[in-house]
């Protein structure tokens, strides 16, 4: 038999393959291309955006990747290499579970990249991880469309590129944990199709289980979509002939397979669910499910065009762009006569469900777990892109059903153009602007550029449809279209990166590497100096999660996976707490000491946050990002208590401490802990009759200038006069002792003011030479906390001045601030020293510890209970003298341990709730998967392989018979000598339709 010329869409004969490696490459080179093409495209975009190593200073850190996630990667890297624990972490909010953070942010298999690569290139490893996720998304989508839609290899590259470079994928490089959704979604969808078509189950179970483990949040969204896709494919998508009983049987088995998915992922799902139940579920308060729409439907039109980045804040629109090739093929999908009506109905169902989910606010909230997302809206929009590209692929694979004419092509182009013109006319009513962080549409680079691309793709589709029988021509046109699609995707990515930078800014490499390395180095030196278990903090911040990278055990932290009990307590003590973010602003010796903050690192620029009574221990010199010599100094708090200590058991009379006045809360905490609070039992209720005060309130006089004062509920509204030049609120008070004075301003409506202080008076009796107080601002960012005013000689008169800020860009705008209470308190160090010394007498002497285990001895006296400043949450196993005991919750924040009088050995060990059960179900799930493969899927695969073999044999016989017929015809005409039979064979091969379906492949 004559040999065949190898066409790009033709099977590769064994004799042309050479060795096994070449055979493998011949079969899979287009899959490799689907992986590497998006990687190269994003690298080109990064290079033009000056990301390192193409630029000197650029990094991929932006928004939460800069402020949160990079630190989580640092922490999980420490845990992997033995410097921490996967279960528990001491660098967050006084400590807390870590599996929730892993499951919410870090459980992706791609996280191994930053874990295994050197820490010195962690930013580059994050970029490599991003690239690998986008490349793998291209690969998995290529697998999906070649198996499901039977598209040819070269043409699959067009659409795998469009999918992997969708707007969602490019923009969410700043939230890389969500990219796993676009990686595993095609495999899950293919698994559903395999299950319905031929009964294979493992292809559904394994990718969905991995997705549930990789990211709990996106896994939840894919779970919803899985149900929708199963419904679509069972009733509309499959070509299998099913009976009524088949629908019931398959649905029952599908449910069983989903249970196996949950069994295999329970070791992650259960701990994550526990972590979320500590506060995330209730974080946003009672959700508002009242009906409302979120945009005009026509506003989705530019979302299908390139360069359509709106915003990552709550004004943003759904990120559904996935290439103009997809946009132009969508109307052709419904015009295609080769696509059956049931598939059109089914895909329309999916599009409608996803559209109305985005359009109707309560439906949108359900996709986000019943809450309105904080920035980054429509986090499931990649599902729409998946559906749209799938529709485009189906249309392209059946171009013969369109019978494209110039009229049809022109009609599609004019139809899209008409919609564009309609939107452009309506755009002023949508209040878009072209600068700033509000949403906007660039008419030229979105619509003009998009319509040019639409014209190119429509012309390409027209010529492909007219040359269906010429494989070489089709391949050339497809190759050109792939190049154009790639250029479009690359330019769109670069445009998105620039607009992200304009809105929220990318961080520089040195701003991270220099600061974090210096912090890790000084922490290592501190560990050498004192290797015991203690807490430490710092007075400076790159971001609030620095402690995770430094390895410091502190209170500063930011995460969506929060323990609201402990962050509320941190606020109660007067530290900074905003939303779910806590920071070491607002510290006092009393709070620091009782929470065990033994060391504080200072960079000599934030003296307002450093207590003057703390003792310097050592200094560490380094160079900052500007190559300037800098010094970090470590200070010791001489009164810091252990992680656990004995207190008076009357503490159990307090349910919690209020957050209206942090000084009262601190007074009550230490007073009750030392037995100095008097309680009365009246009619079954326990009342507070008095307590010791370590802070006493100072009398204040309030005066204003250029300000109107009016009541605002139980608060006071201070409004600047219309012609005000310097609207101020003056607070006057007198120092009673030489101890520190502290300030806290209470409000329910934060509006920033500038803060000043003076204790100097001029000859006219007015205060002069005001200096900045604290950070210079209050009610701004993290500056809503206790502020140390300073220490003064007794009798010194002091003025604290608040300046209401005027708006220079909008001078007519009414400016104001609202304050409920001006709290100025005098600290009494002698009383504090007296009582902190009592607590020092019975501390937990820790002899052994790691991140999830603590062991030590402690001596209890009659009427005492052991207080640990470890946040109260399930998972701790506590033993006293080898016997398990049940803890009690103290102040709705901490773990308390009842002890009998005497000396005891107390051990605590943490295991995430549900983890052990999850490991058991994982083992069972894997065993069931193996059984399913051996008893079911293996046989199905063998049967499909046999069918494939028979089909290939039949095709070979048909080809051989056709060639013999041609040869006989040639010989009968006596033209053998003048005709190249091999060329005739090749012509016959090339006449085959490159778009024909190969059902056996699926």
Q: Predicted segment positions?
A:
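Membrane-interface coil-to-helix junctions
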Residues: 39-141, 161-182, 221, 276-283, ...
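Hydrophobic alpha-helical membrane-insertion signals
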Residues: 13-98, 501-504, 509-544, 548, ...
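Active-site-proximal, structured, solvent-exposed surfaces of multi-pass membrane proteins
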Residues: 72, 686, 690-955, 1001
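Contiguous transmembrane helix-bundle modules in multi-pass membrane proteins
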Residues: 218, 345-365, 371-515, 903-952
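Extracytoplasmic/lumenal acceptor-recognition loop(s) of multi-pass membrane glycoenzymes
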Residues: 484-513, 524-595, 641, 647-651, ...
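Start-transfer (signal-anchor) and selected internal transmembrane alpha helices
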Residues: 1-52, 249-253, 459, 475-481, ...
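Membrane-embedded helix bundles of polyisoprenyl
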Residues: 38, 130-148, 153-238, 250-273, ...
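Periplasmic/ER-lumenal interhelical loops and adjacent helix-loop junctions
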Residues: 63-76, 109, 250-253, 257-337, ...
